[in-house]
């Protein structure tokens, strides 16, 4: 009888210790687990509001993650100062909008990766990968300014239990020249944020040269790899072209013993979608042939080539818009959207541009995503 009581007390004590460890050691234990092993992600486009049906649409697609992107502002690519744009941004890019969106998503079982970007004003054709200071003093100033800016979002993510943070995106020159400064930034982030960290390296040259992957939880790639050189490629040609990229990605994953996230991946609904996937629709010729079928094939080849690779943690598809109105089906939404686009073009006195999108939500590619994102 005494032995039984002693054993019972011991079991109770052990249970309390284990429960205490769960509470203190991992403050994220109450989070909803993904339905599938992969990160079924979408790059969320912030707007002036969010409605419940916006999140329902994501759930219906089978997505389990969204990324949210607030911005910091530089006045030219050699400016050592970064401005927090919290009060001069779309509501969804402000702190309040980010927090509200993440909370609404979490109610439906959707996790969030916070992915702040730098926007360069007066860029003169330069972008984030071209950021370069003109002296050591200015480099120190830039990294100090960047650290202050990114720590703002690290604290916001921690305070609101946002599950992942992308510490930077496509800073090619800075990552090659100053990896130690990036390690310092990462160490400072770790002091205030306990979730997972990644960095979004550009597909061209950068992802293979970043040397601080071992300080992060995942390798992140902005995966706009060129696949073919011709319009309207076959799916077989697209799958074949993924071969060389798969080999380099797998090699990198094995080198650092880290899984890889495509922090962005997407294709436009054009015949040349697989030639230069990174090209913005606004930069295309107005006569660029539209091809929803090519976009759909690009996504089919992407999933068939990579989704079952053990080194792949998941995709964040560029990009997904909120809508102010709830429509019964896509055709109704598309009809209304085309009507509004014609009205806007008429008011501006300009011809309506072709309906070229990155987002698969407007095209047949949506069903490809749904098929793969809802498959166990």
Residue spans of the language-model regions?
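Boundary/entry segment of secreted carbohydrate-active catalytic domains
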Residues: 25-60
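Aromatic- and glycine-enriched glycan-recognition loops and surfaces
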Residues: 45-59, 83-107, 145-148
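Short, acidic/polar
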Residues: 46-59, 143-156, 202-212, 296-305
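Glycoside hydrolase catalytic-domain groove-lining segments
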Residues: 92-95, 99-101, 107-108, 115, ...
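Active-site neighborhood of glycoside hydrolase catalytic domains
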Residues: 177-199
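Aromatic-rich peripheral "rim/lid" segments of glycoside hydrolase catalytic domains that contact
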Residues: 296-298, 305, 309-376
């Amino acid at each position: 009888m005494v032995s039984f009581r002693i054993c019972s007390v011991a079991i109770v004590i052990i249970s309390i210790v284990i429960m205490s460890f769960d509470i203190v050691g991992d403050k994220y234990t109450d989070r909803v687990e993904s339905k599938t092993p992969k990160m079924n992600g979408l790059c969320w486009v912030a707007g002036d509001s969010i409605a419940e049906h916006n999140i329902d649409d994501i759930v219906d697609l089978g997505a389990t993650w969204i990324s949210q992107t607030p911005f910091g502002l530089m006045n030219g690519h050699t400016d050592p100062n970064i401005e927090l744009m919290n009060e001069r941004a779309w509501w969804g890019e402000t702190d309040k909008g980010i927090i509200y969106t993440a909370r609404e998503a979490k109610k439906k079982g959707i996790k969030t990766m916070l992915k702040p970007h730098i926007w360069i004003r007066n860029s003169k054709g330069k972008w984030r990968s071209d950021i370069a200071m003109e002296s050591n003093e200015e480099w120190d100033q830039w990294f100090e300014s960047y650290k202050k800016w990114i720590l703002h979002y690290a604290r916001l993510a921690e305070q609101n239990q946002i599950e992942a943070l992308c510490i930077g995106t496509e800073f090619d020159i800075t990552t090659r020249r100053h990896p130690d400064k990036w390690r310092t930034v990462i160490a400072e982030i770790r002091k205030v944020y306990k979730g997972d960290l990644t960095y979004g390296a550009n597909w061209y040259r950068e992802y293979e040269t970043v040397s601080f992957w071992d300080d992060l939880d995942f390798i992140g790639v902005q995966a706009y790899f060129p696949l073919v050189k011709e319009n309207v490629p076959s799916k077989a040609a697209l799958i074949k072209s993924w071969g060389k990229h798969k080999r380099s990605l797998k090699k990198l994953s094995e080198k650092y013993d880290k899984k890889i996230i495509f922090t962005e991946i997407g294709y436009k609904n054009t015949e040349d979608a697989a030639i230069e996937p990174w090209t913005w629709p606004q930069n295309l010729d107005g006569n660029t042939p539209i091809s929803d079928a090519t976009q759909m094939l690009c996504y089919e080849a992407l999933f068939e080539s990579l989704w079952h690779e053990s080194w792949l943690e998941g995709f964040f598809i560029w990009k997904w818009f909120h809508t102010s109105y709830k429509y019964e089906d896509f055709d109704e939404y598309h009809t209304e959207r085309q009507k509004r686009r014609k009205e806007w073009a008429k008011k501006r006195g300009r011809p309506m541009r072709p309906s070229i999108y990155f987002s698969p939500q407007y095209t047949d590619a949506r069903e490809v995503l749904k098929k793969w994102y809802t498959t166990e």
